[in-house]
Every structure is written in structure tokens, then in C-alpha cells.
Amino acid sequence: MGINQSDSCYLTPVPHEQRRSPTTMGLLWITMTTAFPAVLIGFEWHKQGFSFSQILFCSVLGCIFLLAYAIPASLLGAKSGLGYCGLSRVVFGRWGTRLVAANLIWMSVVWYGIFAVLMAQAVNDLLQVHYSMTVMAIIFGLLMAFNNFFGFAGIANFARFIAAPVLIAWVGYTFFKTINMVPHAALFEPSHQPMMTALTVTSSFVIGFAVWGNEPDYWRYSKPCSLRIAIPMVIALLIGQVIFPITGWLISQTTGITNSDTATAFLNNYSFAGFAIIGLFVLAASYFATNDSILFGSDAALETIWPMKHKTAIIILAMVGAVTAAIFSVNDSIKTLSVITDLSCIFLPVPTVIMITEWWLREKFFRLPIDFANVPALIELPAIDWPAIIALLAGFVVGTVTSGWIPGLESLHVGICSIQAWLTSAFIYTVLRVREYRMETVGQALIPEITEQATESILIEP
């Protein structure tokens, strides 16, 4: 992803002199959160009957919720210089750290697989060929590991400085071209869906698609400044999670297209006059760069929990990702993407929310700053940190139950499942952690008194 893993150990804070500039980090994050599938989901939302005003309002609201999480998560990485797995050791204990790492790995593999499928789909749609989706998805799943395997920075740099700006310019040009063609009355038409349904579906996608969960893995390379983190995040979300899906909705409104395959081909003809190779080139760079970043984070989790050679870890992750892509290739890619975003907005951020809560409690209430310079080895950790594990599982349960994906519990599909999961985990962890801290404080206060009483009893004995 353009940041060499040899720069520093995963469990050692990144030195300040090795931190990247705001421009580099900003371009990196924009590349990671502005992707073409966000345009395709706009077609799906139009098909489901959501109005323009609903899409606009719910997308912006979802971005605000996401920023409330992502800025503290990224700032924690920048202040500590540590990544996701290093920070998790401070909070979750030995087995909890393994659980958190495994959680990140399986979700990353799922994302890796769907982007390989989307790349295969782009080839078929733009070149108007009918190659086997399964075979192509497997091939791309393996090829997308090339950059991480050999440690080249050129592909990621090309994606940041060329492909991402071209993709943004492509969608931006389409947005301004289309919005002038849509009758103003269409922008204010009433919706066929309740506002709460629109909020649940739209905001969950925005959060699930743009959240990474392991933001500290990337922002540990940034200088600790809230403004330097917030500005690129706001820009990235405005482009990738507001303008991109609205563009898809506008085109669907204008053309009546609802199928993602047809939509990709139409966008290429609409913007590049049918030069398919240009659109394919831009999408390939974007998808390859995204999976490059996904592998970077999942490799960090795998290597810090189960030590192995870097290339061995990449081979394992790429092969599992390719198999996952093969499984996804036989299903509707947009529906699969929607399911993944619903799961992602729950399972990826909840552990980080707990880490943020611990950091906040230590800074504001306990007055016990974390020693980021010394990350304990796994063997030095307690087996289980119960407050963190209970809060983690509670967040997972609440988010999953309210996501609407469990048969028989559709009636509980209300609100934004991710926000409910985050608030649950933060609240439960705060209550349990404060209780634990008070018990520890009382215990430490009693030690001198107990020692004094024991000494007196010894002296009194004949």
C-alpha cells in the first residue's frame, strides 16, 4: 500500500521522523474509501424506491456518524504510533487479542474476495466478453496479492496519484453532466419507502463500505493532528459516500437502468465514448489498490498473532481470498456487497470502539496514560480481559440482531445496526471497566493497612 512493512515492527510505535505528510496520508485515505461500487449501489437504491432527498440526507448522516468513530480511531493510531493489534493487547488480554485479530482477518478476506469478483465483473461488462466469472475471480484474487508479496510501492503510488484522481474525475464529470439532465421535479418526488427504512439501508451501507475497523494500522504513519486527519476524511466521504451513490441514482433515474452490469458499461460509454480500455484501466488500478490495503492490514493481524514469514502470510491470505471470490462469483455481486457492508459496520469497528473507550477513560478519568512505547508480549497478558470481551460480544450480538439478517428477527431490524452495536459496546465497557478500576483502587488502598495489621499481629505474638 505504499508504506513498507519493514519501516517498523507491527508492535513498535512508528518514529515521528518516519511519519508521512498530510498530503500522502490524505491521498491514501481517499484511495481507500472512494471506490466504484459506491456508484453501483446508487442504481440499487433507485431500484428499491428511495428518493433523492432520502439518499442525500441519509448518506450525509451516515458520514457524520462514521466521522464520529473514524477520527478518534485514526487519532489513536497517530498518537500512539501503534497499529490495531498492538493497541488490542492493551485492552483485550491474550485470548481476546487473538479473537480480535481473527475477526479482522475473516472480514478482510471477505472484502478481498468481493473486490476480486467486482474486478472480474468489470472485465466482462466493459469488454463485452463472457469469460467464466469464477475463473477470473480466482485469477484476480491471486494477482491482487502481487504488490504485497514483492513489496513494490509503484502500484499503490500509481493508484493514489493517478487512478484515484481519474476515477473521481470520471464520476464527478458524470455527476455534473447528469444532474443537469434530470428534471428538477424528479429530485423532489416523494419516496415509496419510509424514511426509517432509507436510514437503515443507506446509512448502514455508507458506514459499512467506508469503515475499515483497523484505521490505526494506517494512521499510525501520520503525524498526530486532528485537523490533518479530519480534512481528508471529510473530503473522501463527501466524494465516495455522497457524490458517488447519488451519481448512480441520477443515472438510474434518467435511463431506467437498475442492473449493475449494464450500469458499468453505460458509464463507460457515457464518459469515455466507448473506449472500454480506459474505464477498465481506472477500475483495475482502484480495485487492486484497495485489495492491496486490505492485505496490508490483515497481514499485520496474522503475523503479530501467529508469527510467520511475510510471504507465507500473503500466500495464505491470497489463496483464502481467491477461494472466497470463487464462492461469491456465483451470486449477485451488489447484493453480496450489501450483506458484507451490513456485517462490516458491526464486526470491524466494535473492537476499535472499545480501544477508544479505554483510551478515553485513562486520559479523562483514571489519569493513567497508556505506555505506548512498551507493548507487552502475549505471554505477559492476562488470559482474558472480561470487561472488554463482554462488551465486544454484546456489541456483536446487538448489531447482528438488529441488522435484519437473522431469520425470524426481521421485526428487530430498526435503526442503524452499527451505531447500536457501537453504543452498546462502549456503554458496557465503560460500566465494567470503571467498576474494575474502583475495585483495583480499593484493593491497592487496603494493602498498606493489611500489611500493618499483619506486622502488628506478628509483633504481639509471644
Model regions: which residues?
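Hydrophobic, membrane-embedded alpha-helices of multi-pass small-molecule transporters
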Residues: 20-39, 174-180, 188-251, 272-292, ...
